[in-house]
Amino acid sequence: MKNFLTTLLLIFAVQSCFLPASVDAEGLPTKVPLIKLEYPGKPKNIRMLYVKILSLGNRTVNQPLLLDTGSSGMTIDCKSVLPAETCSDTGIKITQDQQIDGIMVTTEAAVMNYGTYDEYGNVAYARVTFGSPDSPVSTITSIPFLIRYKTVNRSTGEIVGGPLWPKGNFGISPVGGGGPDQMIKSPMAYVSVGPGLHRGYYLSPIGTKWTVCTNEDGNCPQVEALHIGVPKDVKKDFRVQRWKQTNWRYNFPTLDSCLSWGSEPICRPTLYDTGNSTIMVVTDASKPRTSLKTGTKVLVKTDGQEDWNFTTTYNPEVEIVPGLEHNIVGIRYFEKNSLLFDFETREIGLRLGH
């Protein structure tokens, strides 16, 4: 009965977040600061964005998680949430569902899939608060997420991790989900917005300057680039179209894009992904993995969008990946350009140059 009632509440919460917004005077989007991080060491130029989780339930967390437009649902490392003695590589040491500081930790196991890695953990429920302490954003109800106890390389079975690995993922794709019956969905599906705004969000340019830093040292710069709530006057600056979920297995929407560099264009459904440090282009599974040389001029043509031209500045920045099913446009795009999702109209939009 408890699970049935929880499911009903979650369905109501998600549906309410996709209802039309109020027609009152238009409010302002909520700005969420993002942490810009370039990892130290080798390989160089691994660049990511993070959003800080302030609290889960009644528990203060203050844990940055990887911001990922290419997945849906939140995961967080066990030791960031629960007592260390509860966490191990073999599982979370509980024998029954437990309420801990407003977090319902269940015994239900789940696996979340990311590229070549899988995250194992338990389903939990809590109200999530994230962003800036000065202007925090909270989900309107407790939401499901994964407390992970290990991350595994899918091809080798090796448990991976360490100080410089993300302590979890903040997946904000508006489609799909993870865990049983895709129940673990984007926290953005449970966030309300100001009057007159469409539910959704947009990412403004994060800038081209990067700093080698770590979340552990707390020395990374921040940029207010995530905006929750879509105003009409902002949306009109984007070229928008209905989003596509090309394959039911994809936990992300795609656009039909072609990438070329003085050769035949490579056209595939394309993910615009903050969670990927490089740009990845499809090639035949029998070919080797390669990358473009520094100084290569690249053209990205997308149906219904302006052409995006750029020149590679390091290697690997554009990788040619055998067996990949879709193209991935990674963090380079977000330095000077914008991405928008309107949940109410189910539209995706790009804006070049600002």
Regions picked out by a protein language model, each given a short descriptive name:
Residues M1-T6:
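Positively charged n-region of N-terminal signal peptides that target proteins for export
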Residues T7-S16:
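Bacterial N-terminal signal peptides
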Residues A21-H354:
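Pepsin/retropepsin-fold aspartyl endopeptidases
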